């Protein structure tokens, strides 16, 4: 696996492209929150990706939650780092969004090259 950090000045363009390319793909989302007592809370979500948005203060992703049937949103305030994980064939496999005390890891359930899904309704 290859990991590539996305430069902050590229975040807006990256997320616009990423959302368009991967909208509707099945994902697993893990969120980790660290508290002052050093305990860590973890939440998991499965569903279809609906988009990722970024502004100066926050990165948010929206997923159709399979368990509840509702749109769920996870966000990181004051994001510090965005890392894209890819296979050796440069297929996107995961996205990591790191904040001061929180982290979201989005993993694709069935990663495949984007050109293989062009024109397929998801």
What is the meaning of each model-derived region?
Residues 1-14:
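Charged, alpha-helical interface segments at or near domain boundaries
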Residues 14, 33-35, 48:
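Short secondary-structure capping/turn segments at boundaries of alpha-helices and beta-strands
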Residues 15, 19-20:
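N-terminal helix-cap/turn-to-beta initiation motif at the start of protein domains
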Residues 22-32:
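A short, Trp-centered hydrophobic/proline-enriched beta-strand micro-motif
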Residues 31-37, 63-67, 97-101:
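Short acidic, glycine-rich loop/turn motifs
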Residues 36-46, 75-77:
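Short coil-to-beta-strand transition motifs
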Residues 48-93:
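Amphipathic protein-protein interaction modules
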Residues 74-122:
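Helix-rich interaction surfaces within compact, conserved domain-sized segments
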